[in-house]
Amino acid sequence: MKSGAGVAEIYEPNFGITRFSCFSGIKVCRLDGRTGKPMGTPPRLHTVAARPGGAPIEAPFVVRHNDFFYLFVSFDHCCKGVKSDYKVVVGRSRNITGPYIDIAGRDMRQGGGTLVIAGHDDVFGPGHNSVLKDSDRYWFAHHFYDGERNGVAT
């Protein structure tokens, strides 16, 4: 994975997540394989996830498994300690440009997403995840705020 300047290159050659905004949605575009920068002037952006009314969505992460791409994003509000309501949702697609659909058949461009993790017990605002593969196992990494330690970030 390469990253920098708002661009993260993922598992599909020459495609990347770019120009994502907490309030305008997550977009992908083709990248120049040599420079890693978006291709085209302007680049052709594909919206892959958004929320109605500009509700917060950020922290995209895409992983490919078998014939599907899985798009993980964080919904709601981070960085408020024990008042954080951040959560992670996921959808999948056969194409990196979408559409990404959740388990209930909802399109992530329309606010869909299957809940992966949300706050519980003394865990507040889990989000901004990554998925790592080690041999044949996948690991889900994320941050959260620890309610047992007055909202310390972990």
PLM segments and residue spans:
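Carbohydrate-active catalytic/glycan-binding domains of CAZyme proteins
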Residues: M1-T154
